[in-house]
Design a protein with these regions (language model features):
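Internal, well-folded beta-alpha domain core
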Residues: 153-160, 164-166, 195
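Conserved "HGTGT" condensation-loop signature of ketosynthase/thiolase-family condensing enzymes
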Residues: 1-94, 98-124, 128-143, 149, ...
Length: 278
């Protein structure tokens, strides 16, 4: 397990807000395999989606939803009900390819050829809404980010919702292209373009085997180990996925840092102190 700690504004206050990363999963798929992923069998132990639910979904939504299903499938017992959970979807540049193709089609063939699905499926909120509706989660759901700072904005939004909403937990879903694909004249991307999704389930709890710490500007560092942080360190989504996997395997070397534009530090590392408490 992992935990999240939001350091308090007052340096004299020793209590933080802690959340487990109760489960997480990463899914990567090349563009050529995403059509099959829309209709792929669900992971053993994961809930099913309505038939053809992802038929018109953007690639970010397909990969992000699959990451959530994988994380649910590996959720440790006892698995909670997710009915009241919130969802934060934080994609980086979603809907770009479909939007480009639509604009080209509009210019060439007129408005009658434009699909009505383009607006709801390519909006910033499409990912979060699909997870919430498809998996019957009735907590707040919101799309955040959409650009290069999607990770930082996703983390701070998620912790804000957990701190100020009466919800038992929250799914935070990040998506991005491994390398943002270059489209051809028809708006088509290379078939080997790789889309990545990382799903993280956050729940209030005690410390786990690792921790994810957000230190706000002007606050004290959570521990001496946090003094290692450097303003130049900016962890990527791929590195976050690797750190989460390492923490789940008990790797004491796991250490990931992302410095937000406004100065907050987001860090995940193995929590050796929690090992001693077991």
């Amino acid at each position: 397990m992992c935990s999240v700690i939001l350091e308090p504004q007052e340096p004299s206050c020793n209590d933080g807000l802690a959340y487990w990363v109760a489960s997480s999963a990463t899914v990567e798929s090349p563009l050529s395999e995403i059509p099959a992923l829309r209709e792929a069998p669900f992971p053993v132990g994961a809930p099913s989606l309505p038939g053809r639910f992802l038929r018109h979904s953007d690639e970010h939504t397909v990969v992000g939803m699959r990451a959530v299903l994988e994380a649910i499938a590996r959720f440790p017992d006892p698995r909670p009900s997710f009915e009241a959970f919130g969802v934060v979807g934080s994609p980086c540049l979603p809907g770009r390819m479909a939007s480009a193709r639509t604009l080209m089609q509009l210019q060439a063939e007129g408005p009658a050829t434009v699909s009505p699905h383009i607006v709801p499926q390519c909006s910033l909120h499409a990912l979060a809404s699909a997870v919430s509706v498809g998996l019957s989660m009735h907590g707040p759901n919101i799309g955040i980010g959409g650009g290069p700072e999607a990770m930082a904005e996703g983390f701070i939004t998620s912790l804000s919702l957990l701190d100020h909403s009466n919800i038992p937990g929250l799914w935070l879903v990040f998506t991005e292209w491994k390398n943002e694909p270059t489209l051809d004249a028809q708006g088509i991307a290379p078939p080997d373009a790789m889309c990545r999704g990382v799903a993280i389930c956050l729940m209030p709890t005690q410390r786990g085997a690792a921790r994810l710490t957000i230190t706000l500007p002007g606050t004290r560092l959570a521990s001496n180990s946090d003094a290692r942080t450097t303003p130049q360190a900016t962890g990527t989504l791929a590195e976050l996925a690797h750190a989460l996997a390492a923490c789940n395997q008990g790797d004491v070397r796991a250490d990931w840092l992302h410095v937000c534009p406004w100065g907050a530090h987001v860090r995940i590392s193995h929590d050796c102190a929690a090992d001693g408490e077991k």
